[in-house]
Swiss-Prot record:
This is Glucose starvation modulator protein 1. One of its GO terms (molecular function) is RNA polymerase II transcription regulatory region sequence-specific DNA binding. GO terms for cellular component: nucleus. Residues 376-445 form the PAS domain.
Length: 520
């Protein structure tokens, strides 16, 4: 019976790296000493041997390959994209012995022998340019892991033998998305250590000079530059933290240089930016009538700070109460303070989201997105007969349907030819306060895209009242009233910062009770 260990002995004991055959069969705690304590205690010290572990399949195949070909690894072509990793072979169109300087896998990894075999690949410049970097990513991952140390021992004179002229197409995944993901993983593994020349890092962008010039070329610099350039430019969706070499910035085509000069030229940049003059929604409505117009014409930046200043000026004027008694005037001031506190709650988030923008280009992109969404929402409003108003997050109206214009007695020019806020159409202070409370609930954090509410919209004070005598009942009540109460549904469209960019409100009038009108 095994001796029961004390708690102190249990804490002090350490598991052995490999058990002996006796302890392994009896499931005993073995020690690192040979013979171990259990075998000495049972007088079988001469039989204490390390247990033979079952070898994995890939190690068995590697051992067989080592016995069959002491200097080379046989190369297979397989249609399965996983064959290079599972079978221990590397896909290629050639079955010749490979040089360790070429970055390919050979048996030097297993035998630790330094054997140099000349490369059989010809120096074909056109085929090197056509080589696809995607095809050699599997080889790169293996070679990077196995031969980083051996690559530093290769003389620079043998660097011309490092790039094969033909690449196998068997290592490509059938799915483009899976293949791109595999490339990203390969880039991460390859960049985890200092860069060493490998086939795919030099096959796509490298051009080998003529033979008489090979002695004067520093291939280490060439391979470092081409590897950095390939990983940065061929797959820009992943950032590997490369710094910009000064010579890479000069390798631009003439067209790229002209475009860059136009962007960086201050005189050209002034044409992209816009002046502080206000451009009404009626003007932009005529400029951007279709999606093609958005990309064909210059985008007019929208000045959100100016719009917020105009909104503040309107609110102060609306809640001033100059001609009201002191009690009502104080109530107006209290309502204004409530609104300003609601605006101040989400204002810092809006400012911080736009601080990191590259002005004016990011602002142009946001405005282009806004105009593109506005066209879609206007088409949507034309498909239904609900009275519709579309406004920005500042509250400025950018689109209004004919149905609500006829209900409220306004014209299109009177609304869109100047800066008109949705709050200007609201009849009472309660509707305005309720608007800002609802907007605060969706401005930050809450990503709900729809809101259901009630509000009162004011009719045009200068509307035609000549039809008052000819109307009776419900129509007369709607005509004589200075406002119409609506049930409204807001649909919130957000920008790339998840901030409300565009709000489409659909308004259904609440008919007064009486004269046979059923009220729910």
């Amino acid at each position: 019976m095994t001796k029961k260990l004390s708690p102190l002995e249990k804490q002090a004991r350490r598991p052995a790296s490999r058990a002996c055959s006796f302890c392994h069969s009896k499931h005993l705690q073995c020690s690192n000493n040979r013979p171990c304590k259990n075998c000495v205690k049972r007088n079988i010290a001469d039989q204490c041997r390390d247990v033979e572990r079952k070898r994995a399949n890939y190690m068995t195949l590697a051992a067989k390959n080592k016995q069959g070909s002491p200097n080379t690894v046989s190369l297979e072509s397989s249609s399965s994209p996983f064959s290079p990793l599972h079978k221990g072979h590397i896909n290629s169109q050639s079955s010749q012995p490979l040089d360790p300087s070429s970055g390919r896998v050979n048996t030097d990894f297993f035998s630790q022998s330094e054997t140099t075999v000349p490369s059989p690949w010809p120096m074909d410049l056109e085929s090197k340019e056509r080589t696809n970097a995607i095809l050699n990513t599997t080889d790169d991952v293996l070679n990077k892991i196995l031969y980083d140390e051996q690559a530093s021992k290769v003389p620079s004179a043998q660097a011309s033998e490092m790039t094969p002229s033909n690449s196998s197409i068997d290592g490509v995944f059938n799915s483009n998305y899976l293949n791109q993901e595999y490339l990203m993983l390969g880039d991460i593994i390859l960049n985890s250590k200092p860069a060493s020349p490998t086939p795919s890092s030099t096959s796509e962008y490298q051009t080998i000079p003529p033979n008489e010039m090979m002695g004067t070329v520093d291939y280490n610099e060439v391979y470092r530059d081409t590897k950095s350039k390939k990983l940065k430019e061929s797959r820009p969706f992943i950032s590997l933290g490369f710094s910009n070499p000064p010579d890479l910035d000069n390798r631009k085509l003439p067209g790229e240089i002209n475009i860059a000069n136009e962007i960086m030229d201050p005189s050209k940049r002034a044409q992209v930016t816009t002046t502080n003059d206000y451009v009404s929604p009626l003007v932009t409505r005529h400029i951007y009538q279709s999606v093609q117009d958005i990309y064909a014409n210059k985008i007019i930046n929208y000045e959100y700070p100016t719009s917020y200043h105009a909104l503040t000026f309107f609110l102060k004027k609306r809640f001033s109460g100059t001609s009201l008694p002191p009690e009502q005037k104080q109530q107006k001031r209290n309502n204004l303070l409530i609104i300003l506190k609601l605006i101040a709650s989400y204002r810092p988030t809006f400012i911080s989201a736009h601080k990191s923008l590259l002005k004016p280009y990011d602002l142009m992109f946001l405005e282009m997105t806004f105009q593109r969404s506005l066209i879609d929402y206007e088409k949507l409003s034309h498909l239904n007969s609900s009275p519709t108003i579309i406004w920005r997050r500042t509250g400025e109206i950018v689109s209004i349907s004919d149905e609500i214009l006829s209900l409220l007695g306004y014209s299109l020019n009177s609304i869109l030819s100047k800066r008109t806020f949705i709050m200007e159409l609201m009849y009472d202070d309660e509707s305005i306060i309720n608007y800002f409370k609802l907007f605060k609930s969706v401005a930050v954090g809450n990503l709900h895209s729809s809101i259901i509410t009630r509000c009162k919209l004011m009719k045009n004070p200068d509307r035609d009242r000549s039809t008052r005598a000819s109307t009776t009942g419900t129509e007369q009540q709607l005509t004589e009233a200075d406002y119409i109460e609506f049930c409204a549904v807001w649909t919130v469209k957000r920008d790339l910062f998840d901030l409300p960019m565009l709000i489409m409100g659909q308004f259904l009038p609440v008919l007064p009770a009486g004269d046979g009108v059923r009220r729910y």
